[in-house]
Amino acid sequence: MTSIKFYQSFSAHLVQHSPWPILVSFSLFNLAIGTVLTMHGYSHSSTTFDLGLAVTVGSILLWTRDIVIEGSFLGDHTKQVQEGLIIGFILFIISEVFAFISVFWAYFHSALSPAVELGSTWPPVGIIPLDTFSLPLFNTIILLSSGAFVTYGHHAIFSGKRLDSIIGLFLTVALALIFSYFQAFEYIHAGFSMSDSVFGTVFFASTGLHGIHVMLGTLFLFVSFLRQVNYQTTKEHNIGLETSILYWHFVDLVWLFLFLVVYFWGGA
């Protein structure tokens, strides 16, 4: 660790070229195309979807492996590289904000001025929305609790309480998996589908987009948990953990807005 700190004190950019960003971009595009084709019932569309999903997941895992090797074993994450990672993460969050803005825009566009075909009311005639204060409220408590535990684990690292930090990260990942399970349970037992008017479309699009981000954030936090277990995170060397925690708080904030708008206000 001493030699890694020594090399990381230099301002040179040591990270080599990586194929994973471009591979993830193309595989995500392929996954999106496969999703659309599958929803429209095109033949062999599931092959496109499965291929896109497999390449995306594989590329993300291999990308994560390379980052861990570069940062923890090779000492390639110098000050300049760390600054680049932080700037890249900020740009990533900004792009995510605009992605959710587009979804909420679609929701408000339909909800604030319902079309005549929908009965000029929101939710549309014939749609029975989910009970806000049952499973959605329970999921909200779970997700916000996970945010509290990840903050506890974060502070434990800087306080030198390694075991407490591991427990905090473990509970965060566990609660994230529970949230995803109940979200899937909610989808299965919902009284409407994505094809049931624009209400179903924007509901599943907004909550589904958030669900994808929950799964991605769970992966980030699980990697941070494993790195903490293997003594790869310190007070000075924690860019991956910091960005994972900030991303998780972003996911928490988006869900809180989703709960208030889609479930509480939109489902009333």
Swiss-Prot record:
Entry keywords, A to Z: Membrane, Mitochondrion, Mitochondrion inner membrane, Translocase, Transmembrane, Transmembrane helix
Reaction catalysed by this enzyme: 4 Fe(II)-[cytochrome c] + O2 + 8 H(+)(in) = 4 Fe(III)-[cytochrome c] + 2 H2O + 4 H(+)(out)
E.C. numbers: 7.1.1.9
Compartments it resides in: Mitochondrion inner membrane
Residue stretches in coiled coil: none
Superkingdom of the organism of origin: Eukaryota
Pfam families the record matches: COX3
Listed Gene3D superfamilies: 1.10.287.70, Cytochrome c oxidase, subunit III, four-helix bundle
BP terms from Gene Ontology: mitochondrial electron transport, cytochrome c to oxygen
Transmembrane intervals: 19-39, 49-69, 85-105, 124-144, 165-185, 202-222, 245-265
InterPro entries the UniProt entry points to: Cyt_c/ubiquinol_Oxase_su3, Cyt_c_oxase_su3_dom, Cyt_c_oxidase-like_su3, Cyt_c_oxidase_su3-like_sf, Cyt_c_oxidase_su3_a-hlx
Keyword Membrane: yes
GO CC aspect terms: mitochondrial inner membrane
Membrane topology: Multi-pass membrane protein
Any one GO MF annotation of this record: cytochrome-c oxidase activity
SUPFAM superfamilies: Cytochrome c oxidase subunit III-like (SSF81452)
Subunit structure: Component of the cytochrome c oxidase (complex IV, CIV), a multisubunit enzyme composed of a catalytic core of 3 subunits and several supernumerary subunits. The complex exists as a monomer or a dimer and forms supercomplexes (SCs) in the inner mitochondrial membrane with ubiquinol-cytochrome c oxidoreductase (cytochrome b-c1 complex, complex III, CIII).
Function description: Component of the cytochrome c oxidase, the last enzyme in the mitochondrial electron transport chain which drives oxidative phosphorylation. The respiratory chain contains 3 multisubunit complexes succinate dehydrogenase (complex II, CII), ubiquinol-cytochrome c oxidoreductase (cytochrome b-c1 complex, complex III, CIII) and cytochrome c oxidase (complex IV, CIV), that cooperate to transfer electrons derived from NADH and succinate to molecular oxygen, creating an electrochemical gradient over the inner membrane that drives transmembrane transport and the ATP synthase.
Family as reported in the entry's similarity comment: Belongs to the cytochrome c oxidase subunit 3 family.
Annotated protein name in UniProt: Cytochrome c oxidase subunit 3
Organism: Schizophyllum commune
Source organism phylogeny: Eukaryota, Fungi, Dikarya, Basidiomycota, Agaricomycotina
